């Protein structure tokens, strides 16, 4: 053995030791970040859960149905046509793949916002129990299968009359954009998936995941951190911070399921729940949280108004000062609109504004969302879902909840009570 070997070994170890000591000394002291634990904030009995999950479903459907007749209208046009909307009204509008599937449907009828609640519920309950963790590829394949079923039904139509074909085409076309993204995702084709996702609905930062996120929050009740992560995982159609908003929408719904929760505790999710650390993003920070800050400022400014509105508004049941405050809030929100109304950032902003301005009151919040216009049925559906989960079915406006249940079951053919039972059984049995 070389006599110098022990000396060389000692020399190397000494250098490494000094290097380690130097590295430790030069490392700047900083706090250790630990991801928040995904824990339940409260426990729900089976009966409590059923009331809240049904409240979520029906509350969302009420919002969808109230906004559907004036979807994409400017608020001035809503006031000219209907005054201030406080109830369910007939859908005097043509059918479309994303909208109602029939012309001039009865009051209480709904659009794709409610169809998505149905579809995600069927995905969540396809197994005996709600899985501990959701699988995005399973979700993609589920949507592909649904699209293929609609395509097969179209091919099987033998009719001279075009109406049956046109009707089935609407059902297939509704899922067409989604299926084009889901297929390469399920197949693991990263390039094709990124290309199709980035041109999904024209490449807009759409509110795709927000359409089904409340239901994910509903199956992870009182566990906003877990709900966020599961919804984020299934947000495969989202671009950019729209995916963070999808997670937050689920998280707000999950917290809304907690007994005794306040509206401010629900919206506080925007800064309390951040498992993927969007708040630590360089240069930008967390845009979804900035929307929360914007809304808090807007509502505070609007509530300062003390001069009554001079012009009455047909259908508005509040005071002249309350109308002036509402108009001020709308005016301030106008400065924060996106180019396309169904941009996730705009839907998120309007949802927060509705909840904060109405201080968690279901009726007032949904009215706020509907009467602003733009993509009002989607905003009202998200707001209605969150506050429906908060208050529960039994505390929703009686006439509207009963009308919505009946129309949904008998005309739309979506039985909301049955969906709630399926989710409850999958969760508790």
Which sequence ranges carry the predicted segments?
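Structured, active/binding-site neighborhoods that engage oxygen-rich ligands
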Residues: 18-429
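N-terminal secretory signal peptides that target proteins for export/translocation
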Residues: 1-2
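Sec-dependent N-terminal signal peptides
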Residues: 5-14
């Amino acid at each position: 053995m070389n006599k110098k070997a022990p000396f060389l070994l000692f020399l190397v170890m000494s250098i490494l030791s000094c290097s380690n000591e130097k590295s430790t000394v030069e490392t700047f002291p900083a706090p250790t970040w630990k991801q928040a634990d995904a824990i339940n904030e409260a426990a729900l009995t089976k009966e409590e859960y059923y009331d809240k999950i049904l409240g979520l479903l029906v509350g969302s459907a009420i919002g969808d149905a109230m906004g559907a007749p004036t979807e994409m209208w400017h608020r001035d046009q809503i006031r000219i046509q209907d005054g201030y909307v406080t109830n369910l009204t007939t859908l005097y509008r043509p059918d479309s793949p994303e909208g109602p599937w029939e012309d001039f449907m009865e009051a209480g009828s709904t659009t794709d916002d409610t169809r998505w609640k149905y579809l995600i519920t069927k995905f969540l309950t396809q197994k005996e129990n709600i899985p501990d963790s959701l699988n995005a590829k399973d979700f993609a394949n589920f949507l592909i299968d649904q699209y293929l079923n609609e395509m097969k039904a179209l091919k099987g139509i033998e009719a001279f009359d075009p109406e049956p074909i046109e009707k089935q085409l609407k059902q297939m076309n509704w899922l067409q954009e989604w299926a084009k993204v889901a297929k390469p995702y399920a197949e693991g084709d990263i390039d094709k998936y990124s290309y199709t996702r980035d041109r999904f609905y024209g490449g807009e930062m759409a509110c795709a995941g927000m359409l089904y996120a409340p239901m994910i929050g509903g199956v992870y009740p009182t566990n906003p951190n877990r709900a966020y992560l599961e919804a984020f995982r299934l947000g495969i159609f989202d671009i950019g911070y729209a995916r963070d908003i999808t997670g937050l929408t689920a998280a707000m719904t999950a917290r809304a399921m907690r007994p005794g929760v306040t509206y401010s505790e629900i919206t506080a999710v925007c800064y309390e729940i951040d498992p993927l650390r969007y708040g630590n993003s360089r240069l930008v920070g967390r845009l979804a949280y900035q929307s929360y800050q914007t809304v808090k400022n807007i509502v505070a400014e609007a509530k300062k108004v003390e001069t009554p509105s001079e012009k009455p508004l047909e259908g508005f049941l509040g005071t002249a000062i309350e109308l002036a405050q509402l108009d001020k809030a709308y005016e301030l929100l106008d400065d924060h609109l996106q180019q396309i109304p169904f941009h996730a950032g705009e839907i998120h902003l309007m949802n927060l504004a509705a909840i904060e301005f109405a201080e968690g009151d279901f009726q007032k919040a949904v009215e706020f969302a509907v009467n602003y216009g733009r993509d009002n049925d989607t905003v009202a559906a998200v707001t209605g879902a969150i506050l429906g989960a908060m208050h529960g079915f039994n505390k929703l406006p009686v006439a509207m909840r009963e009308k919505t249940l009946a129309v949904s079951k008998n005309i739309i053919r979506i039985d909301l009570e049955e969906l709630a039972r399926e989710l409850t059984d999958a969760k508790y049995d």
